[in-house]
């Protein structure tokens, strides 16, 4: 899906929305990083996948991601642990918590971008809803909420 046909540049629109099929979080993250440049990335999801992690690793190897944190759900822990080695290559920190939220936060000196989505970091052909905002208040409100989740989580280390 051509993201430029769905969304305007981040600098032109502080709030953007999409409801439909064909939009995947990984592609959206790549589109955002093309505009922001190298940034810290926070991902919160119920579940993740090999495909998402492999794509995330490609973004990291292209030096688009500085620091990265993943917060996943405890109930999806079996799948998460099976993907842990790949996660180690992608993320500086991986946390398991009571989490069903699906957000991506992208931050550097010039941008604070928040993505709120109904989509897990998996692939499917179902309709999903996504909102992108560059509103600073929204970004930091979500970051504070994510920190609260992390404060009540378990960090995966060296499995």
Predicted features along the sequence, with ranges:
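PLD/PLD-like phosphodiesterase catalytic module centered on the HKD motif
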Residues: 1-159
């Amino acid at each position: 899906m051509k993201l430029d046909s769905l969304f305007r540049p981040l600098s032109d629109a502080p709030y953007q929305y999409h409801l439909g099929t064909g939009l995947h979080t990984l592609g959206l993250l790549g589109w955002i990083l093309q505009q922001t440049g190298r940034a810290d990335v926070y991902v919160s999801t119920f579940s993740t996948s090999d495909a998402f992690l492999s794509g995330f690793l490609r973004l990291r190897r292209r030096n688009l991601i500085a620091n990265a944190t993943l917060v996943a759900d405890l109930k999806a822990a079996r799948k998460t642990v099976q993907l842990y080695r790949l996660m180690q290559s992608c993320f500086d920190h991986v946390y398991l918590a009571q989490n069903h939220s699906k957000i991506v936060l992208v931050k550097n000196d010039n941008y604070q971008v928040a993505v709120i989505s109904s989509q897990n970091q998996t692939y499917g052909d179902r309709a999903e809803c996504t909102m992108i905002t560059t509103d600073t208040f929204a970004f930091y409100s979500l970051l504070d909420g994510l920190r609260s989740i992390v404060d009540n989580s378990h960090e995966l280390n060296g499995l």
